């Protein structure tokens, strides 16, 4: 089975070809429309996804009821709410499609079965989780150590699809700024591109 979505497994050097094939076969192709929820607050996640095509985001509602984007998922990334899926608890987050999306999905029971059957999958899982921990830690530090402009440029460099397809309000909440501030940052970058 050939799909760029599975590159995340192929990049792990220890999988044998037959293990990869079994993992790939365990994924089901699913399609969601723009605005569809993959997971809603209060529900328990029962599957994880690999985003094959499109753009999705996770968000929480703050104490005032405002949506705050916690993550943007781009093509070939794993879309998961780790705490809910593995601890079997209701999530505080929502995951929604910003555009029409195509995914590869694996349910929790199938994942658990393969995780215990294929030793390399558990090794891959540990490596993936530690890498995600690093990414989230780095993001939490950058909120305090980088200017809003630098955070915007960083997002533009890492995930240009977000800038292209996500509404301004969602990007602003992810960066920790107001819509007005983000509009000003964008205007400054257009009129003075060399300053940053």
Locations of regions flagged by a protein language model:
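Short phosphate-coordinating micro-motif centered on Lys-Gly-acidic
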Residues: 38-43
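Short beta-strand segments in beta-sandwich/barrel cores
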Residues: 28, 37, 55-60, 78, ...
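Short alpha-helix-to-loop micro-motif enriched in aromatics/charged/Gly
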Residues: 64-67
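Cyclic nucleotide-binding regulatory module and flanking cytosolic helices
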Residues: 1-28
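Short, Lys/Arg-enriched N-terminal segment that forms or immediately precedes the first helix
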Residues: 4-7, 132-141
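Phosphate-/nucleic-acid-contacting segments
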Residues: 146-196
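Glycine- and acidic-residue-biased ligand/ion/polar-headgroup-sensing regions
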Residues: 35, 46, 50-57, 75-76
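Cyclic-nucleotide recognition modules
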Residues: 69-126
């Amino acid at each position: 089975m050939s799909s760029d979505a599975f590159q995340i497994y192929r990049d792990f050097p220890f999988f044998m070809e037959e293990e990869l094939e079994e993992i790939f076969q365990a994924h089901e192709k699913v399609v969601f429309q723009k605005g569809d929820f993959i997971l809603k607050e209060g529900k328990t996640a029962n599957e994880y996804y690999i985003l094959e095509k499109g753009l999705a985001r996770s968000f929480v509602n703050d104490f005032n009821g405002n949506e705050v984007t916690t993550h943007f998922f781009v093509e070939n990334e794993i879309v998961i709410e780790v705490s809910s899926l593995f601890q079997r608890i209701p999530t505080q987050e929502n995951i929604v499609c910003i555009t029409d999306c195509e995914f590869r999905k694996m349910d929790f029971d199938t994942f658990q079965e393969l995780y215990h059957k294929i030793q390399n999958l558990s090794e891959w899982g540990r490596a993936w989780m530690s890498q995600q921990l690093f990414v989230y830690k780095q993001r939490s530090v950058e909120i305090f150590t980088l200017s809003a402009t630098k955070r915007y440029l960083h997002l533009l460099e890492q995930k240009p699809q977000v800038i292209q397809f996500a509404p301004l309000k969602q990007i602003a909440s992810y960066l920790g700024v107001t819509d007005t501030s983000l509009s000003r940052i964008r205007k400054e970058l257009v009129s003075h591109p060399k300053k940053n």
